[in-house]
Amino acid sequence: MAIKTNEGKLIASGLKFGVVVARFNEFISSKLLGGVIDGLIRHGASEEDIEISWVPGAFEIPLVAQKMANSKKFDAIICIGAVIRGSTPHFDYVANEMSKGIAKVSLDTGIPIAFGVLTTDTIEQAIERAGTKVGNKGYDAAVTAIEMANLLKMI
């Protein structure tokens, strides 16, 4: 008996994607969004198969991701934004609850949700991850969404 191995393909054609973008720290989020769109299009998605929803901040991402997932219109959802540490504990609360919320939506709905929200200590770290020194984490999230959408269709 052979071992069956499942692995999602990086082919986005025919798939529909929802993207939730936090407007807070928009100068970073817009670069991440560019990476998401680039990643999806390069792997065969059409612009008509991408729907983008902007939310005020990272804390609001899970609710809109849940609404998108429950609509059953999307094969995968991509969440992007930037939470940058400040001098108060606010960062910890927002990053923690947003992360848990996104994971809960994915587990509750069975829709893959790619986590492309930067949680960094400095603005410089965020800039590095939004298309400069460390690549674009939006692009990486798009590739993750494609792979997971295809993998879940196989299982």
From Swiss-Prot:
UniProt key word Thylakoid: no
Q: What is its EC number?
A: 2.5.1.78
Please provide, in alphabetical order, the Gene Ontology terms of the cellular component aspect for this entry. Answer: cytosol; riboflavin synthase complex
Q: Which residues cross the membrane?
A: none
MF (Gene Ontology)? 6,7-dimethyl-8-ribityllumazine synthase activity
- Source organism, top-level taxon: Bacteria
Per UniProt, 5-amino-6-(D-ribitylamino)uracil binds at: F24, A58, F59, E60, A82, V83, I84, F115
- Which pathway does it take part in? Cofactor biosynthesis; riboflavin biosynthesis; riboflavin from 2-hydroxy-3-oxobutyl phosphate and 5-amino-6-(D-ribitylamino)uracil: step 1/2
Binding residues for (2S)-2-hydroxy-3-oxobutyl phosphate: S87, T88, R129
- Pfam families the record matches: DMRL_synthase
**What UniProt keywords apply to this chain's record, in alphabetical order?**
Riboflavin biosynthesis, Transferase
Q: Which reaction does it catalyse?
A: (2S)-2-hydroxy-3-oxobutyl phosphate + 5-amino-6-(D-ribitylamino)uracil = 6,7-dimethyl-8-(1-D-ribityl)lumazine + phosphate + 2 H2O + H(+)
UniProt record, GO biological process: riboflavin biosynthetic process
Q: Quote the catalytic residue positions.
A: H90 (proton donor)
Q: Which InterPro entries match?
A: LS, LS/RS, LS/RS_sf
Task: State the similarity comment.
Answer: Belongs to the DMRL synthase family.
Q: Which PANTHER family match?
A: 6,7-DIMETHYL-8-RIBITYLLUMAZINE SYNTHASE, 6,7-DIMETHYL-8-RIBITYLLUMAZINE SYNTHASE DMRL SYNTHASE LUMAZINE SYNTHASE
What job does the chain carry out? Answer: Catalyzes the formation of 6,7-dimethyl-8-ribityllumazine by condensation of 5-amino-6-(D-ribitylamino)uracil with 3,4-dihydroxy-2-butanone 4-phosphate. This is the penultimate step in the biosynthesis of riboflavin.
User: This protein is called what?
Assistant: 6,7-dimethyl-8-ribityllumazine synthase
The record lists the lineage as: Bacteria, Bacillati, Bacillota, Clostridia, Eubacteriales
Give the encoding gene's name.
ribH
